[in-house]
């Protein structure tokens, strides 16, 4: 059958053959079950299931006076240029929070640099949060708070758009961040007034270490450049010195030529 292995389909047949030949003393207990419910014989692989993006909105439908909760399903666009080797891989499950989270952290990349606590007590901490307000008890304010607040507005406020919900959540986030900065500054001033001393923070320490490393590298680079120039100069000087030492008779001949030229020049002038 080529690359197809049908050994699993013949497991009952092999077990009965081994029992009849005496290789095994007892018939396996699963023989009757396999005869009633045989393994699947379909060799065609089906494509993985497409997961739709489910959204909950509160909208005022035509002909209705009160807004109603509507569940919308949006199909995810398939990627046409998909490799054949990835055709049967499971499809990615997407949630509405993924798009909101991507938009927020794209607009606020420095929020990813803030330390976060990802430890949970029982895995159900989200159940006690009430996202009708942005600030939660027992949870530090971060970008995830903005995402959950925006999702709450989209799911509960009638006829609100994604941009409006994002602006509301972002405005509340900026106000709380400003309040935290003011509280931190006031606490630092009060502590200094009572004699507290604050050393450099982690960012300043890191910058100082980086400057020291740069200075060490600069000294090393200057030494390397100086040694390289000395090697080139020594090589050129050794070549010229070797030529001069190989011909010691050149210097006396040059001295004799210079003396004769000096003595001959005034004589020519007098005769003229």
Curated annotation (Swiss-Prot):
Coiled-coil residues: none
Molecular function as annotated in GO: structural constituent of ribosome
Sequence segments annotated as region (Disordered): 236-272
UniProt keyword Ribosomal protein, yes or no: yes
GO-annotated cellular components: mitochondrial small ribosomal subunit
Subunit and interaction comment: Component of the mitochondrial small ribosomal subunit.
Protein name: Small ribosomal subunit protein mS23
Highest classification ranks of the organism: Eukaryota, Fungi, Dikarya, Ascomycota, Pezizomycotina
